[in-house]
C-alpha cells in the first residue's frame, strides 16, 4: 500500500479507520501483531519500514534501548550497552517491533562494540534512507574501560529540535 493507501487510513473514521489500519498493517508489515521468534543473527533479521505519513514535515524520531546486549567475539562474555537512536525520516519510518527484534538478534552475536554500533546504524540507513541519523552506543565497562561509540550521518537538518541524548558519561563508583 503506497501513499494513497496511507492517506485513506488517515482520513477514515470509526470502524472504517480501524479496518483500514488493520488492512494496511497486514499488507505491509509481516512481524507486527504476529508471534515472531528472535532472529538467529543480525544478518537474517528483517527491518521493516512503512511510509512516512508526514513527509512534508521534518521531525525527529527517538528510540532508546537501555538493555542492549551482544557477546564479546573473543571471550563469549556478554557486553551491555544503552543505545539511543535519533533520526529524521524522509519517506520511510522503521517499524518498532522489527527494530526490537533486530536489536535482540545481537544477543548471541559476537562482535566488538564499534562493529555492533556501526552495523546497526548502517542497516537502519539502508532500510529507511533517513534525512539524518545519529546513534549513541554507551557501552558498559569490560576490562575496566567503558567504550562509547557515536555515529552521525552528517549535520542535523536546520530547524529540527534534536535534544541531547541524556546519557551521562560512565563514572563507576567515583
Curated annotation (Swiss-Prot):
Location of the active site: 72, 79
Subcellular location: Cytoplasm
Residues making up the signal peptide according to the UniProt record: none
Gene Ontology annotations for the cellular component aspect, listed alphabetically: cytoplasm
Enzyme nomenclature, EC number: 1.7.1.13
Pfam families: QueF (PF14489)
Main EC class the enzyme belongs to: oxidoreductase
Binding-site list for substrate: 94-96, 113-114
Domain of life: Bacteria
Keyword set, alphabetical order: Cytoplasm, NADP, Oxidoreductase, Queuosine biosynthesis
InterPro entries, sorted: GTP-CH-I_C/QueF, NADPH_dep_7-cyano-7-deazaG_red, QueF, QueF_type1
Pathway field: tRNA modification; tRNA-queuosine biosynthesis
GO molecular-function term, one example from the UniProt record: preQ1 synthase activity
Reaction(s) catalysed by this chain's protein: 7-aminomethyl-7-carbaguanine + 2 NADP(+) = 7-cyano-7-deazaguanine + 2 NADPH + 3 H(+)
Gene Ontology BP, a term: tRNA modification
Family: Belongs to the GTP cyclohydrolase I family. QueF type 1 subfamily.
Function field: Catalyzes the NADPH-dependent reduction of 7-cyano-7-deazaguanine (preQ0) to 7-aminomethyl-7-deazaguanine (preQ1).
HAMAP family in the record: QueF_type1
Protein name (record): NADPH-dependent 7-cyano-7-deazaguanine reductase
Amino acid at each position: 500500500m503506497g501513499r494513497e493507501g496511507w492517506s485513506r487510513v488517515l482520513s477514515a473514521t470509526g470502524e472504517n479507520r480501524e479496518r483500514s489500519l488493520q488492512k494496511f498493517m497486514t499488507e505491509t508489515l509481516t512481524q507486527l501483531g504476529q508471534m515472531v521468534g528472535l532472529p538467529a543473527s543480525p544478518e537474517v533479521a528483517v527491518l521493516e519500514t512503512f511510509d512516512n505519513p508526514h513527509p512534508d514535515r521534518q521531525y525527529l524520531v527517538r528510540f532508546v534501548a537501555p538493555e542492549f546486549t551482544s557477546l564479546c567475539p573473543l571471550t563469549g562474555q556478554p557486553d551491555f550497552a544503552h543505545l539511543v537512536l535519533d533520526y529524521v525520516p524522509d519517506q520511510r519510518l522503521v517499524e518498532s517491533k522489527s527494530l526490537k527484534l533486530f536489536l535482540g538478534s545481537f544477543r548471541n552475536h559476537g562482535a566488538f562494540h564499534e562493529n555492533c554500533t556501526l552495523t546497526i546504524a548502517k542497516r537502519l540507513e539502508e532500510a529507511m534512507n533517513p534525512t539524518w541519523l545519529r546513534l549513541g552506543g554507551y557501552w558498559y565497562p569490560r576490562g575496566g574501560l567503558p567504550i562509547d561509540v557515536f555515529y552521525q550521518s552528517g549535520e542535523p537538518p536546520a530547524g529540527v529540535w534534536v535534544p541531547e541524548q541524556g546519557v551521562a558519561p560512565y563514572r563507576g563508583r567515583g
